[in-house]
Amino acid sequence: LGIEREAGDVAVTDLKEGRWWYPTVYRSADGERRGTYVNVCTPVEIFPTEVRYVDLHVDVVKHADGTVERVDDDELDDAVEAGHVPEALAERAREVASAVESAL
């Protein structure tokens, strides 16, 4: 988000099984929204004592002023080039990021 943490800030993450992304909403101590960070990942798996997913590097940020920005495409590209993420999975991550970006 590019903002400094302040005492009393709260981050709330909303995980839903099977979704290819999850948002974390950041608020100040007085409840003012400081921004939302949406992580793109493999489908979220929820178990009784843990949550599992693989981060796919690309993310979408909605700043407090309402501007939306897609970030870390370069990290995804680097992961593909290094052989850590297959191209087909990277393409799905890009599609998900684009859909989230449009929805925000």
Regions found by a protein language model. Give the residues of each.
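Acidic, polar-rich N-terminal leader regions of halophilic archaeal proteins
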Residues: 1-104
